[in-house]
């Protein structure tokens, strides 16, 4: 949700995200300096397993501020990056133009048509090694939509295309996951598309770590491509039945607001970000002490969902 950025950034009513806005850059700098205290020694150059680091993420889908991208690049180097830097974007010219830097390795994100898409990259920047940083095994599931599925033959067929043109790829996702609480986020194009709690994504391993038909198909293909013998796989994870849970007590939500949150008095409704709240809900209450004629209640600028009592 919100790209992992903290909600309190928007308490600055002039805040501009993912660009060369000084206050935003200062917060990014603070974060990176603290981050590298944790990951600096984990780089391949130091004997670790971090082989490369990415500048931003699909920035060409959002903006084209080259000063900002150069700032992030320099910040990462100043913080101690010793491995290769790269960018990762969609395949059309506007995305590649906005999200890349001339002297930084460029990678692509897509889920099919590898040969065609890498040809588009060649037109944009010749002789670039072919790398798909996000090979999409599936897609997001949104509330109210059908569950996205993708056949194992389709996934394996795309991987074969990568192998046929000597391209590299990274699975997105290899292991299904879970968006806990309110962290799922959403897409928002012509309409708002909230993502469900599950991040299954038709990954090769399920959300609970079990094998899928696509896993076996891709495994067979890769073993054959590398002339490797088939070895025994770890056992599938054991599942358990939780059983019946008896609930014999309850309480009113509205009678417990003071136990669940902090009360604030403000002249006008403020957003969650104003209070530094990343997710969840806010209960707004007001008293109409004057006499009003009956009229339609209008609530503007609701972002996500509002319940009116």
Short names for language-model regions:
Residues 24-40, 46-54, 60-61, 65-69, ...:
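Carbohydrate-binding surfaces of carbohydrate-active enzymes
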Residues 2-171:
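Substrate-binding/catalytic cleft of secreted carbohydrate-active enzymes
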Residues 1-9, 91, 99-114, 254-260, ...:
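Contiguous N-terminal and early-domain "leader" segments and peripheral loops that mark the onset or edge
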């Amino acid at each position: 949700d919100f790209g992992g950025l903290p909600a309190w950034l928007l308490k600055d009513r002039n805040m501009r995200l993912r660009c060369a806005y000084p206050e935003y850059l200062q917060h990014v700098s603070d974060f990176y300096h603290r981050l590298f205290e944790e990951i600096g020694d984990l780089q391949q150059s130091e004997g670790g397993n971090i082989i490369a680091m990415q500048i931003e993420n699909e920035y060409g889908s959002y903006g084209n501020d080259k000063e900002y991208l150069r700032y992030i690049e320099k910040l990462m180097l100043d913080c101690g990056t010793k491995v290769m830097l790269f960018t990762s974007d969609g395949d059309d010219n506007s995305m590649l133009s906005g999200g890349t830097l001339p002297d930084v390795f460029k990678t692509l994100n897509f889920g099919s048509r590898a040969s065609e898409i890498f040809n588009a990259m060649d037109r944009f920047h010749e002789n670039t090694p072919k790398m798909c940083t996000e090979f999409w095994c599936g897609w997001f599931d949104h509330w109210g939509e059908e569950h996205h599925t993708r056949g194992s033959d389709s996934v394996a067929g795309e991987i074969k295309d990568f192998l046929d043109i000597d391209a590299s790829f990274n699975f997105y996702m290899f292991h299904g996951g879970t968006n806990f609480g309110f962290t799922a986020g959403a897409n928002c194009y012509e309409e708002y598309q909230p993502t469900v709690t599950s991040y299954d994504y038709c990954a090769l391993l399920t959300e609970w770590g079990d094998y899928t038909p696509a896993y076996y198909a891709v495994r067979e293909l890769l073993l054959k491509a590398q002339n490797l013998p088939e070895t025994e796989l770890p056992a599938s994870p054991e599942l358990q039945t939780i059983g019946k849970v008896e609930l014999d007590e309850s309480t009113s939500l509205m009678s417990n607001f003071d136990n669940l949150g902090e009360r604030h008095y403000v002249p006008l409704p403020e957003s969650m970000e104003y209070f530094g709240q990343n997710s969840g809900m806010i209960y707004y209450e007001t008293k109409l002490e004057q006499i009003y004629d009956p009229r339609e209640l209008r609530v503007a600028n609701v972002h996500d969902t509002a319940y009116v009592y």
